[in-house]
């Protein structure tokens, strides 16, 4: 009986070990990228290049679909022709206000605002794509791309994607000359955008687990605290 007990104990430990190993493997791969979109960027009328972003449609399907549809313009409105209205070096670049262009506007495909879907993903690296907001459950169309690790935004802003290609363009945007309220002095514009074919299954590197704006008018992540 003692021998049988030892065998059963070993089997249990082996099963637990296999379960933990499989869980770590899945986590290492990160959230699944289900669609890819692109922005073609100009600065002061001169081409900068293309940014390609992967969206985490399984972890945050509603938020990812909002961004995808605004990139394609299939609802009759979206990001094409809009600008990055706020850039802070070593923090983030922010855009998506295609109605007012100054951080006070924008809208989602679900109406003016929609709720925070979840905070399973964190701001663990450069190139994270996340929703700007004016507080709890105020997501519209404004978004930001991180240019540093911004852990203080975790649990406050919904991460829904990452930059796959063209991070050098993000780097160029974060250092453009700017004026009042961190607005570029010359337009950084999304001149063309849309969806790309998913020719290969891609996995992101996010980690499963971004604060109130400076004013009630401005939808934005917190000011630079790095």
From Swiss-Prot:
Activation/inhibition comment: Inhibited by cyclosporin A (CsA).
GO BP terms: protein folding
EC numbers on record: 5.2.1.8
Residues carrying covalently attached carbohydrate according to the record: 139
TM region(s), chain numbering: none
Annotated segments matching region Disordered: 194-226
Coiled-coil region: none
Cross-referenced Pfam families: Pro_isomerase (PF00160)
Keyword entries, A-Z: Endoplasmic reticulum, Glycoprotein, Isomerase, Rotamase, Signal
Domain PPIase cyclophilin-type: 38-195
Family annotation (InterPro entries): Cyclophilin-like_dom_sf, Cyclophilin-type_PPIase_CS, Cyclophilin-type_PPIase_dom
Endoplasmic reticulum is among the record's keywords: yes
Subcellular location: Endoplasmic reticulum lumen
Catalysed conversion reaction: [protein]-peptidylproline (omega=180) = [protein]-peptidylproline (omega=0)
Molecular function (Gene Ontology), one example: peptidyl-prolyl cis-trans isomerase activity
Keyword tRNA processing: no
One GO cellular component term: endoplasmic reticulum lumen
Residue spans of biased composition, Basic and acidic residues class: 211-226
The family this protein is said to belong to: Belongs to the cyclophilin-type PPIase family. PPIase B subfamily.
The protein's role, per its UniProt record: PPIases accelerate the folding of proteins. It catalyzes the cis-trans isomerization of proline imidic peptide bonds in oligopeptides.
Entries under PANTHER family matching the protein: PEPTIDYL-PROLYL CIS-TRANS ISOMERASE, PEPTIDYL-PROLYL CIS-TRANS ISOMERASE D-RELATED
Protein name stated in the entry: Peptidyl-prolyl cis-trans isomerase B
Organism: Arthroderma benhamiae (Trichophyton mentagrophytes)
């Amino acid at each position: 009986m003692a021998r049988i007990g030892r065998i059963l104990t070993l089997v249990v430990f082996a099963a637990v070990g296999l379960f933990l190993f499989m869980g770590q493997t899945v986590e290492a791969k990160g959230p699944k990228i289900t669609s890819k979109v692109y922005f073609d960027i100009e600065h002061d009328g001169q081409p900068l290049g293309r940014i390609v972003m992967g969206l985490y449609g399984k972890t945050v399907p509603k938020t990812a679909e909002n961004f995808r549809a605004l990139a394609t313009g299939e609802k009759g409105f979206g990001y094409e022709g809009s600008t990055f209205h706020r850039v802070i070096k070593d923090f983030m670049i922010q855009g998506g206000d295609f109605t007012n262009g100054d951080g006070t506007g924008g809208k989602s495909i679900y109406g003016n605002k929609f709720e925070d879907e979840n905070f399973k993903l964190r701001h663990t690296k450069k190139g994270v794509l996340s929703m700007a907001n004016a507080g709890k459950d105020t997501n519209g169309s404004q978004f930001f791309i991180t240019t540093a690790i911004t852990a203080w935004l975790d649990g406050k802003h919904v991460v829904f994607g990452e930059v796959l290609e063209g991070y050098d363009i993000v780097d160029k945007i974060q250092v453009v000359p700017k004026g009042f309220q961190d607005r570029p002095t010359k337009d950084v514009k999304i001149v063309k955008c849309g969806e790309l074919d998913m020719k290969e299954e891609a996995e992101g590197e996010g980690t499963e687990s971004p604060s109130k704006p400076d004013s009630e008018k401005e939808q934005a992540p917190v000011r630079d605290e790095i």
